[in-house]
């Protein structure tokens, strides 16, 4: 079995990026750790959307180290940085999870607005870790779109940081 988790930052009004994809409002962590490294130590691979992949390519350095990154796209991908392990995949979320489980991958980090929404709708997300940045941006790309049914969550923990960030963790209730 392959479980899927989300670790994401949002504005207080629920946006993961500005309408143009800019993430500038997320960089207010003040250099303190917010659990990302600990989370990454628990995952075997990442599953991200093409737009998220293209955004990550603009960063100063590749943030995923030697973790395999599976990019969901039906189009060819932009060239990847040296040392990055990147593979293009497409298909239904359940099929993708099954393919990754068959490769021995037990825990994936799902990232990207549409990708998170698709995996949630398919009932494949087990855990959500959401860090809220204390800023209202008024519009942009929402973390959650319309849902076809309620998705009950159970609150596990919340932590407030000196920088003002608030991280909450939820598990998806059965």
Named regions from a protein language model:
Residues 1-174:
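Enzymes that bind and transform nitrogen-containing heteroaromatic metabolites
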